[in-house]
Structures are given as C-alpha cells and as structure tokens.
Amino acid sequence: MTLRTLYQTLLDSDMARLHVIAQQWDITVVAERKPDVAAELADAMAHAEAVERVLADLDDAARAALDDLLRHNGALPWAIFIRRWGELRAVGPGRLEREELWREPVSAVERLWYLGLVQRAFATWAGGQVEMAFVPEELSLYMPVAVPLDVVPPKPAPPPAQQIAGTDVLADDLVTLFAALQMETLNPAAANEKTAWMRLPQASALLETLALEQGWLQRDERDALRPVAEPMLAWLQVDGWSQWAALARAWMESARWNDLAAVPTLHPDPVREWPVDPRAARQAFLDLVRHCAPDTWYALVEFIAFVREQNMDVLRPDGDYDVWALRDAATDRPLRGIEAWDVVEGAWIAFVLTGPLFWLGMVDLDNEPVTCFRLSAAGAALLELGAPPALPEPPPLRLSEDGVIGVPLRRRYARFQVRRIAQPLTWDEDYRYRLTPTSLTLARQQRIPVTRILAFLAEATGQALPAHLRSAIESVYQGRETARLEQVWLLRVPDPAVLEHPALRRFIRESLGEGMALIHAADRAKVVAVLARNGILPETDIR
C-alpha cells in the first residue's frame, strides 16, 4: 500500500526524532535545516545494506510487528497496530532527548517508530479517512517477504444427535413470491400467499432485497413490488443447482442487504445507524468460514472465538471500537468499546450462521437451541471447497381426476405456470393447486390460450389429459355456466312468515320451501342477531 514517501514522513517528524533515527542507523548528518536533514536521512536509509543491518538488530517482538505490517501490504490501521503490538508514548522532543527513551522502548511499536521503520499517515481505508501505520515503500523494497502465518482451524465438535439439513427451499419461496406478485394485480387475495405460503417466512426481507438487487423484481410507480419478466424467467428456467447457486451468490455479493441490521438483539447507532460495509464484512467473514472442513461439525462458541482470534476487526476494519455504538435491543444500552465485542460481533456471527447461511442451505444446524453447525455440500461448493451436490431430478406434476395439481419441490418454472391457471390449496411435501372456473377465468384474462393450458398439463404430467378435465377446461373458456360449491347455513323456522321480515330477508341466499332458507356462512352471526331481536333464540348445530 503506497502512502507517503520516506522523505515526506521524515519531513513531518521533529528534529529530535530525526537525530534518534540517524544515530540508530549510524548515519552522520551534515545538514542543519530539517528539510535537508530529512533528505540526507532518506537517501542514506534507502539502501539494501542499511536496511539489512537495521533488521538484523531487531528483537523478536519488533520483527514480528514489522512482519505483521508486511503481510498486510505494508500497512494497517494505527489503532489495530498498537492494539496488537503495544503503545507509542506521547512525549515531546525535550523529554525524548533528555531521557533517551529510544534506548528502552516500552513496546515493539515504539522500537520500530524510533528506528523510522514505521511511519504514520492518514489514508482512505474502509470508506473513510483512517490513520495508518505503514512501512515506507523505499524501505520495504529491501525487506524479505514475511512468511505467511499458519491458521489453526477451529476445533471440531462431536456430531449432534439431532440435525437440521440446510436445503434450497428459499428458492421455492422465491417462486412463491414471484407467483403472488404476478397474480395479485388480477386477484388482490393472492397477496396473502406472500406470507401463508412461505416455508421460511423469517427470510422474506432477505428474499425481497436480493430479488430487487438482482433485477428479478422492481418497484412500480406506487412502490409496489412487481416481477421483471425477462430476468425472472431466466432464473426460473435454469436447473435447480443454478437457481440455488444464483440465490446464494446474490447474498454473498449483496451490497444492499445488511446482516448486522437484521440481528434481533441489536438496534442501530442513533446517529450513524448501521455504519458497516455489509459486503466487505460478509466477504471477510466467509474467508474465515473457508477454514471449516466440509461435513465437519463446529460449536458456535468455538467458531466465534476463532473469528476473534483471526480477525476480530471483521466489522470494524479501521480498528476503532469507540466511533460508533449500536444499542442493546432490550435495554437500549450503548454497546461501545472492545468489551462489547461478544454482544455485537459475536451476535452478528451467530446470526449469519443460523440465519442467511442456513436459509440458503449453505450450513446444517443442530436442533433448538442451535449450538453447532457444519458446512453442507452446497455451502462447500459455493465457497469453492468442493463439488456441487448432485440434485435428483424431481418427479413430474400429478393431476388428479378432480382437477388438483401436485407440484413437487424444485419444479419451479412449472409451479409458476401452474399458479397462473389454478388456485392454491395447501403445501407440505409438495404444493397443491386446484383448477377452478375462477382460476381459469383469470388465466383467460392473462390471455393464456386454452390450447396452451391443455398442452402444458399434458407435458408437465407426462400423461394424456383425461377427457373429462379437457372438456371442463374448454367449457369454462367457452363461457358456459358451471357448477358452484359454496359453504352455506340452513335456516329452519317454525313460522315461515319470519323469513319475510325485511331485516332477515336480505341475508337469504335461496328459499328451499316451507320455513327453510339458505344463508351465507359469513352472515351467520348477523342472522342470529336479527332472530334474537325478534324474540327467537336459534339452536346452531355445528359438527
């Protein structure tokens, strides 16, 4: 990382420090003016032999601190550097010369500082201006490449007795979202499917954010979500693994979705809200997850400790734990300083593992309460640690003789098409829909030809369409009157004249004969009230 030149950094130093550096490098300075002294020093220091001689005199701690900088391209935020390698005392030039403090440095940082091997300057880092510790490039050119540190992976845990496999059902929820948004413009009741038909309702906010970011959805002039046909269909028509991977990678690369803002135990900083680069933090975290072996279980607490050991600044790359403070969701207490690491960073790590990574099927978990996890085959593949899992081909659609369509999981394009022509019934192991006059009328409003419906059903089921269903579908499309099955109540009264009462007559759907009438199920309570006001307490037979 190129910051300031060696000469510029020396020019910013006071004369006392320049004399200390010259003395320790065994450089005789002739000049008296600071610019000239800085120039002489920079000239004499930037030589291989001079750098090699100074490095040979470093103690182990100072060499380790210098190597730490070199492993990070020669620069680290000053706050992180001094936290790792010790303080630099704030002293004036008089005390420095009088007490000769460089002879007994209190830390590795102080040793490197008075040698001039480490300098300080502000630079753009993690989206802001941050004070950096760095090795001037004129010196680092002559330094050996630091040996990479071996990362000790997290300690494995025993397999739990109960395991919950991460799967690709979030992709099925995306189809539910597409279908509901597509249909609600014709039938507002379809909006209920966005909650009632979600297998992972807790992931709905993530799903909407990713779909918008990927261009599968957009907001219309009324700010309502609407599918974007071409990219949506492109996703629907690829194979199951490609759909799964596209959704997972959308999260991995997302700049809009902020995992920290979704942690339920945290509230935002009152001023800075959620001052974290969500994508950069996620990428740094996933780099640590890559140290987990596939198909190996790890305790959450052990992995959180591993993150703290390897990259505790994963959320705060500037190393500053005081510049912003989230709030405890329960008490509104400010969570400031490194002492709050477990309740901020620790909570974020646990949420990402048990939330998005699990929702996307990248990890498996144990049962509630969650205490451990492992990378799934899909997670290993997405993190480039293994091959993609082999997904079995889902069976064809099933069409019963009464017009109920069963759609297996992963038949996503077919399910989107089915929802355009059929009403949703229920879901568990698969999704079930029913062909009805209302659903087929809506299909006609979408200008779906009846021939296309018949061909689709035959192709998707792999069987010839039963003649009676073909006839029923064609009958609706031709506008013929059809049967209707309704939920009604039968009202019996001893005096037929009661049914002629104006307050009651408006609720009668159909008269059946002497003292009997049908009323709509939704009007039952109103009819009971009318009868009571007229001196009749009805008996209701509910079985």
Features from the language model and the residues they span:
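Type-3 copper protein
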Residues: 1-338, 343, 351, 359-360, ...
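Extended alpha-helical interface modules used as scaffolds for assembling large macromolecular complexes
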Residues: 162-171, 237-543
